[in-house]
Amino acid sequence: MTLTVTNYPFRDRWNDCLVRRAQYTGPSSYATGGEAIDNIDDFGWGETHTLVGTITDGTTQHHLYLNYATQRIMVFLAAGTQVTNGTNLSTFIGQIVATGK
């Protein structure tokens, strides 16, 4: 996964959870079911609890959804359907906010 994480030491808290803001770049070949989060390497925690964000290529916007059970970032079209398997999202970039422990 391509993430550029921004940390703000000692202020990155939401109740008892850590908060991270990151720039997310979509994969070159999206897999149905989403892109796996490597919690330790991507965010520095054991489990992601929430993730909010959108990605765009400058023309089209997609919504990001965290599948909590599988710890995967899923990408959805504005119509509410998941992006199809094999779709190139490498030109889609956006900001995400995630919480975890």
Where are these regions (language model features)?
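Extracellular receptor-binding modules and their adjoining Ser/Thr/Gly/Asp/Asn-rich linkers
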Residues: 1-35, 92-101
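Extracellular attachment/recognition segments
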Residues: 26-90
